[in-house]
Amino acid sequence: MHRPDVQIIVNTTPCGMFPNVGQCLIDPKAFPALEAVLDVVYNPFRTELLLRAEDCDVTAAGGFEMLVAQAVFATEHFTGRQLDTAAIIPAVSRELRHQLANVSIIGMPGCGKSTVGAALAKRLDKKFVDLDAEIERRTGHNIPDIFAQEGEAAFRRYETDVLAEIAKGNSQVIACGGGVIKSPANTRALRQNGPVLWVRRPLEALATGGRPLSKGGAALKQLEAERTPLYEAASTVVLENYGTLTAAVDKAVQLFEADERL
């Protein structure tokens, strides 16, 4: 399909809605004049259709605020009260999105993802999920053993499968492994329900002991050079983790609360 006459797309089907996330009926690239996409699906926040629209630099909006508006207008109807809908709907939508949003943390091995993530989850009253620990729990093997016995490709398959399930959830801080961004499917899974926070830390300050792909020295510099463009492409916000844990968490909270995408 190639339709140069279409400027706006509105999806009113349940395609892409939880639990069947990732489904999409059309490709925005087939519509060269496209200016905006509205998907009335509200879970996840960003369906595959919206993610594809964003990839095309097209204005995209989901159905979450519409869901809130429906509740507000229903309240008016059944109670007979007149509400300040222009103020209430966006305010309630933003508050609920902050409550439900995931914060996914990416970055180089040893940059502090798990440490910052656990503390951030406590501050935001969200569940903390360490993706590597969850992979170990589900496979029954620790990650160095998976790399040694099955290879990196097998580990990456486990990683993608586990993340696909976890990322469907809400109200989580997800600390990911350093190489999670190597798969576009992983990046899309992380983006569907909240911001992706890239934790950056000086190379010499990285804690790399016991990590399969982090040997230090020249190898670590090469790994950073390879992955930095992927972190840049996957992230929506950047946290410079150059100081104390408290400072990093304070800044992460500020970035989350100020995120205009929520």
Question: Predicted regions span which residues?
Answer:
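Rossmann-like adenosine-cofactor binding region
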Residues: 1-60, 180-186
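Adenosine-phosphate binding glycine-rich loop
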Residues: 40-101, 241
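NTP-dependent small-molecule kinase module
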Residues: 87-99, 119, 123, 169, ...
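Hydrophobic anchor at the beta1->P-loop junction of P-loop NTPases
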Residues: 105
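P-loop (Walker A) phosphate-binding loop of NTP-binding proteins
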Residues: 108
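Conserved lysine of the Walker
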Residues: 113
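ATP-dependent small-molecule kinase phosphotransfer cores
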Residues: 133-191, 230
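A glycine- and Lys/Arg-enriched "phosphate-lid" helix/loop adjacent to the NTP-binding pocket
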Residues: 192-230
